[in-house]
Regions:
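C-terminal cap/substrate-recognition subdomain and adjoining C-terminal extension
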Residues: 51-122
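Alpha-helical substrate-recognition element adjacent to the catalytic core
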Residues: 1-74
Length: 122
């Protein structure tokens, strides 16, 4: 699964150009999802030095991205809108459901891994 996440007021509690405190629950679940093999893309309007500062700050929090403001390489094409299964953004409709959705993805992946290769009798 590909998960796009915004930086300002999402990963960080501050708005551009500042970097505030980390959204610890969001970092924790994204780090777990990445460890399960999901792709995480930083999708932000930040550019240049502010973008690099955000990427470096996230790395210090333990989160490294598969791509920044572009598709993961295996998508095979470039588009202005990054292709993803889930978009996490402070301006998104239903933003209060982020953690529930991300935890559901994490638990579903754990379950699939647990039963991978197990044949079911019908």
């Amino acid at each position: 699964m590909i998960i796009c996440v915004d930086f300002d007021h999402t990963l960080s509690n501050a708005g551009y150009p500042n970097i505030g405190q980390p959204n610890k629950p969001l970092f924790d679940i994204l780090i777990k999802l990445k460890a399960q093999g999901h792709n995480i893309i930083l999708w932000t309007c930040r550019e240049d030095i502010q973008l690099q500062q955000a990427v470096d700050w996230c790395k210090k929090q333990g989160l490294e991205f598969d791509a920044v403001n572009e598709n993961v390489p295996w998508i095979g094409f470039y588009s202005r809108k990054v292709c993803a299964d889930v978009y996490i953004d402070d301006l998104a409709v239903g933003k209060d459901d982020w953690m529930m959705k991300l935890n559901s993805i994490y638990e579903d992946t754990k379950l699939r891994e647990r039963f991978r290769g197990v044949a079911c009798e019908v």
